[in-house]
A protein has these predicted regions:
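Transmembrane helix-bundle core of multi-pass membrane transporters
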Residues: 7-12, 83, 91-150
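Cytosolic-side transmembrane-helix boundaries in multi-pass membrane proteins
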Residues: 246-279
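Membrane-helix/interface signature in polytopic inner-membrane proteins
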Residues: 143-176
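Membrane-interfacial amphipathic/re-entrant helices at transmembrane-helix boundaries
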Residues: 1-22, 273
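Alpha-helical transmembrane segments in multi-pass membrane proteins
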Residues: 16-24, 46, 50, 54, ...
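Interfacial loop-to-helix junctions that mark the boundaries of transmembrane helices
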Residues: 4-13, 56-63, 84-89, 123-133, ...
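Hydrophobic alpha-helical transmembrane segments
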Residues: 14-19, 62-67, 92-93, 131-136, ...
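Short loop segments and helix-boundary regions at transmembrane helix junctions
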Residues: 29-111, 207-222, 235, 239-245, ...
């Protein structure tokens, strides 16, 4: 373990994984409870397009990515709320279009870009600046959640009830999707755009198999996410060997998927046993 801490990139990776493991489940709980889990996938693809635009223009890539992701995510939410098209159709259009835009622009770019690192992340790609960005976003998410927890909870449970109580639902919807977009952008270097949505959804799905309490679900999800993220990052370091470097995101998602499968099977077996005992 001390060997890992002797490398700056590993220290950054461990800190980043801790911050992401706390932040992602908080936002993920509100995403899952509103039954818009696929929004995470779409937002990650929008981030991919944003990165490609920034690289292609060679003009403050990070700020360009943030700006594009925020604008595109707000447009996505607006179209989903307008009922002009089915929400699934809107997500599908943004999902495929953003991936296409990103692929074309990166191909046309004069810069040498490792697409695999953008898609899946890399331990070697994480910088101290990335950690600072993650910490800023993480603290913002925690503070906002603490001060607006009650309203966010009611909105997640019942939109109509929230409107009756004169809660500005649109504001909190916009806030959720903007924070999620920014979190995805600042976490791309570590986990990549393809698997970041799994960190939003899987820990929550695991926690929901263990408790029905909203607040407890968040805390359990954070615990599970911390366990899998730290294990995934550490395993990535020990399993990788030049020139083969295993992205930590893949290992993290495999661990989360395995735990989800286990708790799901265990719960189903309990239900089956109860049904059998009643006959």
């Amino acid at each position: 373990m001390l060997e890992i801490l002797s490398h700056d990139f590993m220290v950054n990776a461990l800190i980043g994984s801790i911050v992401l493991s706390i932040t992602a489940p908080i936002l993920g709980m509100f995403v899952v409870s509103r039954r818009i889990s696929l929004v995470g996938d779409t937002l990650s693809h929008l981030a991919f397009a944003g990165i490609a635009i920034g690289v292609f223009l060679d003009f403050f890539p990070f700020l360009t990515t943030i700006a594009f992701s925020i604008i595109a995510s707000l447009l996505l939410l607006k179209l989903m709320q307008s009922k002009i098209l089915n929400s699934d159709a809107v997500l599908a259009v943004f999902f495929s279009s953003s991936m296409a835009i990103g692929t074309v622009l990166l191909s046309l770019s004069q810069q040498i870009i490792n697409i695999n690192e953008i898609l899946f992340g890399s331990l070697l790609w994480i910088t101290t600046q990335d950690i600072i960005y993650q910490l800023v976003v993480g603290v913002s998410v925690v503070v906002i959640t603490i001060f607006s927890y009650k309203k966010c909870f009611i909105i997640s449970i019942d939109h109509d009830l929230s409107r009756v109580n004169n809660t500005n639902v649109n504001f909190y919807d916009n806030l959720l999707i903007v924070l999620t977009s920014i979190l995805i952008v600042v976490s791309v270097r570590m986990v990549g755009v393809l698997l970041i949505s799994s960190l939003l959804v899987l820990p929550i799905l695991i926690a929901l198999q263990l408790t029905n309490n909203f607040r407890n679900t968040i805390f359990i999800a954070i615990g599970v996410s911390l366990l899998c993220s730290l294990s995934g990052v550490t395993s990535s370091y020990y399993l990788s060997s030049h020139p083969s470097i295993i992205p930590p995101s893949g290992l993290i998602v495999i661990l989360l998927s395995a735990i989800f499968t286990i708790v799901l099977i265990k719960n189903n077996l309990k239900i089956d046993n109860k049904l059998e005992s009643n006959f």
